[in-house]
Amino acid sequence: MKVRVYNIGGIVSPLEVELTKGVNIYKAPNAYGKTSLAKALVSLLTSAIKPDDLLNVFANSGYVELDLDGRTYYRRIKRVKNKIMESSKLLLDDDRALLLSYFSPENKLLNQIMSGEENVEWFISATSKINELKSKKEEMETKLHNLQAEIDDLNRKHKEAIELQTKIKQIEDEIARLEKEKESDKVLNKTTQTISITNENKLRDIKEKIEVKKRELEDLQNRIARLDQEIKNKESLASPEIRQSYERQLQEINAQLQKITAQRNEAEIEIRLLEKVLDQIRESEKQHLTTCYVCGSHVDPSIWKVRIDVISKELQEKNSLYAGIKKEADELLSKKSEIEKKLKELDQISSEISKLKMSRSELENRIESVKSTIDDLERQRREMEERFNRNAEIYRVYDINDSINKRIEELKKKKDEYEYELAINGIPSTILNKISEKQKELQEVQKMVDDLEKEYMRRLTIAREEFVKIANYLLKELEFDLRAEIDENDRLVVKRNDATLELRKLSSSERTTLALILVLTALKSYFKTPFFIVDESFMTFDQRRFDKIVKYLNSITDYVIITKSDENIELLKETMEPLASS
C-alpha cells in the first residue's frame, strides 16, 4: 500500500510512504505532520472529513492518494477564487471510520472514557447503525399496515362491484321485459312515436353529459380548495421570519462552538500532561526513588505522596472543568443539529409549496375548460327544448304505454348511476388482480420486517456479548486485575474482585484500554477497516502491554499504522505474530 500526501494539514512538501501488511511504525519529530498523515488516510474512508479541513490554509492545491490492490483512491483539492473544489474516489464512505480507524486523543469515545463518562449507548448506536435499522423497520411496519389497509379496501370494493353487477343485470332484465310488453301494446303511429322518443333520448343524453361535467367541476373545485388549505398550512410553517430566526441561532451557536472548542483543546492538553506527570510520580513513589525524574536533584521519598495529592487534586479540578466544557459543547452540537434539520425541513416545505401551486394552476385550467363545456351543453339543451316545445303539437301522440316508458326511463337512469359507480369502483376481475398483487407485496414486506427485527435484536445483543468476550480476554492478557461488561442500560461497568469501580478513578492506562476494547469490539462486529492507525504519543502503556495490543490489532486488520515521536524520520516494518483474537 503506497500513500502520497501534499499540502494536507502540516505536510507542505510531497510525502510518499509505502506500507506493507502487518505493523508499520512511522517515526517523525513533533509538528512534522504525523497527525496530518493519519487524517489524510482516514479521509479516504469517509466524506465526513471535509476538503476545507484537509487543505493547508496557505496552499492553493493539495492531495492524498492511496495505491491499494492495483487501484488508486484519492482526494484532490484546489482553491479557486476562495472556493474549495474537490475530485475524489474514496476507498469507502462511512463516517464510522472516524471512530473505528484512528485511535488518538481526538477520538470521541476515548475522550468520553477518559473523562469518566460510563454511558456508551451513543457509541453502540453509531457503530452498529442500529438507529438506521430501527427507522427502516418502522418504515416497513408502516408500509405493512398501509398494504393491509389497501387490501381491506380492495376487498370491500370487490364486494361492492359484485353487488353493482347484480343490480345492473336485474335492471337490464326488467327493461327487456317492459320493452317486450310495450311492443305488444303499441297503438300509435310508429314513425311519429319514433321521432318523439329520438328527441327525448337526445335531450336525456345532453342532460346526462351536463350532470357528469357538473360532478367533475365539483370534484375539481373541492380539490383546489383542499390544495389552498394545504398551501396555507405549509406557508405558515415556512415563513421568512422563521428561517431568519433559525439562521441567526445557527450563527450564534457556531461562534460559541468555536470558542468552546479552543477551551476544550486547552483543557485536554493540560489533563494529558497532568495524567502523565501523575503516573510518573506514582511510579517514583512506588519505587521509593530519591531522585527527581525531571531535574535529577535529591528528593525525600515522603514528598512523592504530597505531590500525588497535589497533582490528583489539580487533575480532578481540570477533569471537572473539561467535563463542563464538553457537556456545553455537546449541548450546542445537539442544538446545531436540530436547527440544521429544521432548515432542511423548511427547504422541503418550500419545494412542496411550489409543487402544490403548480398543481393548483393546472386545476384552474381544467376548471375553466369544464365550465366552458358545461356552458356549451346548457346552450344546446335550451335550444333543443325550445325546438321540441314549438313542435310539441305536431309530434304529440296518444300512447297507452306512457307509464311503461316512464318506468323504462327511470330504470335506465338507475342503471346509468350503477354503471358510473362501477366505473369508479372498478370491475371485479381487475380488483381481484390488484388484491393478488398487494397480497404478494404484503408477504414480501412481512418477510423484510421479520428479517429486520431479527437483525435489530442481533445488533442489540452482539455488542454486549462481544465486548465482554474481548474485554476480559484482553484485560487478562494485559495483566489488568479487572473485569468489564456493558449492562442493560448500555453503561460501561468495571469490577475488581466483584466490587464495582468508578470509571474516573481508574488509571489512564486502564481507561485507554477500555476505550480501545470498545473500538475493537465494533471493528469485529460491524465494520471492516482496511487499516487502523494508533497515535502512540498519548498511550500510557508500558512497552510489553502496548506490543500485545498491537498484536491483537494485527489479527483483525491488514494494516496497523503506529505514529511515534522521534528525532529522526523513519518507517519501520515490525514483524510479530498476531495475537489470537478472542
Swiss-Prot record:
It comes from Acidianus ambivalens. Zn(2+) binds at residues 292, 295. One of its GO terms (molecular function) is ATP binding. PANTHER family: ABC TRANSPORTER ABCH.3. ATP binds at residues 28-35. Residues 243-281, 320-351 form a coiled coil. Gene3D superfamilies: Helix hairpin bin (1.10.287.510), P-loop containing nucleotide triphosphate hydrolases (3.40.50.300). Residues 243-351 form the Zinc-hook domain. Keywords: ATP-binding, Coiled coil, Metal-binding, Nucleotide-binding, Zinc. It comes from the Archaea. This is Protein bps2. The keyword Heme does not apply. Signal peptide: none annotated. InterPro entries: P-loop_NTPase (IPR027417), Zn_hook_RAD50 (IPR013134).
